[in-house]
């Protein structure tokens, strides 16, 4: 049912993180979010990394995803997780149908199915 997992990394300074991932490590930018950009999806070969700088020093942080998992059938997963602390599934504007599960330690794990 799972097809891949993607780490979600926090960054204090998105432009600095973007430069590191692209110029130092050679990743390409797949998508970015925010204006100015504060979230990016970076790709190299078959690897993908999400970098999230949504919460600056002057913002109150909310729990962020800790990992992102691609799945083939999000609705079947939602049914299997009945009774767990689950948010969603919900269709997103970026072409994914996602749900979030919170583990016993408060880590938010996002599962998504491509619906684009």
What feature does the model see in each segment?
Residues 1-3, 59-64, 93:
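Short glycine-enriched loop/turn motifs at secondary-structure junctions
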Residues 5, 36-38, 65, 97:
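Residue-level marker for the onset of beta-strands and adjacent loop->beta junctions
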Residues 12-14, 67-108:
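Vicinal oxygen chelate
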Residues 28-63, 108-113:
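Conserved short beta-strand elements that form part of the metal-binding/catalytic scaffold
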Residues 15-28:
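Amphipathic alpha-helical segments
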Residues 26-32, 84-88:
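Short secondary-structure junctions
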Residues 1-18, 67, 114-116:
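N-terminal beta-strand motif that seeds the catalytic metal site of vicinal oxygen chelate
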């Amino acid at each position: 049912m799972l097809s891949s997992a993607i780490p979600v990394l926090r960054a204090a300074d998105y432009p600095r993180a973007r430069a590191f991932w692209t110029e130092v490590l050679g990743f390409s930018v797949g998508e970015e979010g925010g204006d100015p950009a504060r979230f990016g999806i970076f790709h190299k070969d078959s690897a993908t990394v999400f970098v999230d700088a949504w919460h600056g020093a002057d913002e109150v942080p909310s729990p962020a995803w800790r990992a992102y998992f691609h799945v083939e059938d999000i609705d079947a997963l939602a049914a299997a997780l009945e009774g767990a602390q689950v948010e969603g599934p919900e269709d997103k504007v970026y072409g994914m149908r996602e749900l979030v599960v919170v583990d016993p330690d408060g880590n938010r794990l996002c599962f998504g199915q491509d619906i684009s």
